[in-house]
């Protein structure tokens, strides 16, 4: 059985901005999952940094990324991923919750996640 890869916004942004870890993210795209919360973060941050975002979500789908809606079943695990001082944003926690729900590996470039004390398989790219 293959473990699902769940992409954090930071991983996709690293790819778009050709930052360290971009090659690894590119290899993970086909079959990866991503919360629509994280997609929203990617679109906002990419536009903020001058990246053309028109149709970006469709480009990611064409590359094999499957977007998952953030719904009622996502709300509780996302809230439960919060802890005082963890520094995890809503987007971070949505990614972690999705990884937990599907038994997958959350992929991020945010090294702080390793110290957040979450019970999810993590892959920190840098």
Language-model segments: what does each one mean?
Residues 11-12, 38, 74, 94-95, ...:
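Alpha-helix capping/helix-boundary segments
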Residues 66-105, 109:
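Active-site neighborhoods of divalent-metal-dependent phosphate/nucleic-acid chemistry enzymes
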């Amino acid at each position: 059985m293959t473990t699902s890869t769940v992409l954090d916004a930071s991983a996709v942004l690293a790819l778009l901005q050709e930052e360290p870890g971009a090659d690894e993210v590119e290899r993970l795209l086909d079959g990866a999952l991503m919360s629509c919360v994280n997609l929203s973060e990617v679109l906002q941050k990419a536009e903020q940094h001058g990246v053309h975002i028109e149709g970006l979500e469709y480009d990611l789908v064409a590359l094999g990324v499957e977007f998952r809606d953030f719904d009622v079943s996502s709300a509780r695990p996302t809230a439960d991923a919060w802890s005082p001082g963890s520094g995890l944003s809503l987007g971070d926690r949505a990614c972690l919750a999705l990884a937990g729900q599907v038994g997958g590996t959350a992929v991020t470039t945010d090294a702080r996640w390793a110290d957040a004390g979450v019970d999810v398989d993590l892959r920190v790219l840098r």
